[in-house]
Design a protein with these regions (language model features):
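Catalytic phosphate-donor-binding core of small-molecule kinases
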Residues: 6-114
Length: 114
């Protein structure tokens, strides 16, 4: 989602997504293939995952919870019908926050701005 997972996505070379965009980001974590790239898809997309494996089961990890799942299991992902309301101070904006946290436009050579 655009809100709350930007840092995780960035740490895996994923994109920055504006909070008002209605998208999901699928970002591979430590891919073994250089062709595995992040993907941005509409948030009304219904995602179905199916693992093709020679093993009898596989591990799935969601929000620090790990469980073993039989190999014929299908995983479905869709947007929740619930939303959250957030408070944004009048003197803050998404782009200003990014610029500050990611040091955009700053000259960080030789520790001059640290």
């Amino acid at each position: 989602t655009p809100t709350g997972s930007t840092g995780y996505s960035l740490s895996c070379n994923g994109p920055v997504i504006s909070p008002n965009s209605k998208n999901f980001i699928i970002t591979p974590i430590a891919p073994h293939n250089l062709n595995a790239r992040p993907m941005v898809i509409p948030d009304d997309t219904f995602i179905e995952l199916e693992v093709d494996s020679r093993e009898k089961s596989f591990l799935i990890s969601l929000d620090s919870r790990i469980t073993s799942v039989p190999k014929d299991t299908k995983i479905y992902i869709e947007k929740s019908p619930f939303t959250i309301k957030s408070i944004i101070p009048a003197n803050q904006s998404f782009l200003t926050t990014l610029r500050t946290k990611l040091l955009w436009g700053e000259d960080t050579r030789n520790g001059s701005n640290i």
